[in-house]
């Protein structure tokens, strides 16, 4: 599977330091990456409705991290998956009476176009679940060989209950885990399971569902093992960052880590980084609720993609916030002011601004702080003929906002 075209990133004088981000597992700021390189896996879309602003906020946030690493002189290895076969996709296919493969291809193409419009740097490994079935089946076989799976009515389950430190990412109590597992695609109440938190690895063949051959019977993979297998295939362990939205902390990231670590005996990730959820009309923006605002719809209605990106960046990646049309209006005005300022023949000196913007981004990706600094620069007078060009380059290279 291919990603989208990479935007051209301007070069800047000097370098930033390595960024520090909030690690959900340790509940503190940690330095991520090193001068020897950085690796990141970000959970991708299930392509049946893409790309809403909740998606966009997540991928723009991790794009900010990629750009900050690049600015620190770090070589980045970045993988992202596409869950191109899954229960919600199959349900959508039944609802609209279309092949699930066609829906997945169409929505993935739309996602690629949206990411390109938002100037998101693509992952160097953009990988679908279907194309990764050999690796997923191989990982399940490793877990089977270690006695960490069991069969139930043709399905294969991971013995989560056998992992002593399970829950090290979320730190949730057992009752909260079971409740969230039920709410987020799990089956804690299924009769015959050895433990409510045991996770489905392989769903045996069902009528009118796609299936593939495996040593343990035809079927299709469960959610968590997909990401574990793709990450293990394309990135070295431990990952520097496992990323995604806050709704993936549990069960997805706890279970992905448990399965990967059980198979390899190695730590899965040094840091787990999560973005806050975006609301609309008083509720979390989600496909199940249907309260979605799509990037493509905003752009089709005349919004500049750079204004959409600015609106997203004006909220710290870890905060929860609510989308309103006013935010796009404000971002459109800000974009116009920035563009006017960098087209002036002279401006206030930009060297100090560059250092300050870099400092904000290295400190837990403080994009709102960086934006405020550029706002302040646009109001200042100066006679530096190189400043407007430098500020335009830093906005593009560091924030991804092309002026």
UniProtKB/Swiss-Prot annotation:
Residues binding Zn(2+), per UniProt: 43, 227, 252
EC number per UniProt: 6.3.1.13
Enzyme class: ligase
GO CC, one annotated term: cytosol
Cofactor (UniProt): Zn(2+)
InterPro entries the UniProt entry points to: Cys-tRNA/MSH_ligase, Mycothiol_ligase_MshC, Rossmann-like_a/b/a_fold, tRNA-synt_1_cat_dom
Keywords: ATP-binding, Ligase, Metal-binding, Nucleotide-binding, Zinc
Motif 'HIGH' region: where in chain: 45-55
One GO MF term: cysteine-tRNA ligase activity
Domain of life, per lineage: Bacteria
Cofactor: how bound: Binds 1 zinc ion per subunit.
Amino-acid positions noted as binding L-cysteinyl-5'-AMP in the UniProt annotation, renumbered to this chain: 43-46, 58, 81-83, 223, 245-247, 278
Catalytic reaction equation(s): 1D-myo-inositol 2-amino-2-deoxy-alpha-D-glucopyranoside + L-cysteine + ATP = 1D-myo-inositol 2-(L-cysteinylamino)-2-deoxy-alpha-D-glucopyranoside + AMP + diphosphate + H(+)
Motif residue range(s): 'KMSKS' region: 284-288
Entry's Gene Ontology BP terms: cysteinyl-tRNA aminoacylation; mycothiol biosynthetic process
Alphabetical list of NCBIfam families matching this protein: mycothiol_MshC
Biological function: Catalyzes the ATP-dependent condensation of GlcN-Ins and L-cysteine to form L-Cys-GlcN-Ins.
Family note: Belongs to the class-I aminoacyl-tRNA synthetase family. MshC subfamily.
UniProt cross-references to HAMAP family, sorted A to Z: MshC
Subunit and partners: Monomer.
PANTHER family: CYSTEINE--TRNA LIGASE, CYTOPLASMIC, CYSTEINYL-TRNA SYNTHETASE
Name recorded for this polypeptide: L-cysteine:1D-myo-inositol 2-amino-2-deoxy-alpha-D-glucopyranoside ligase
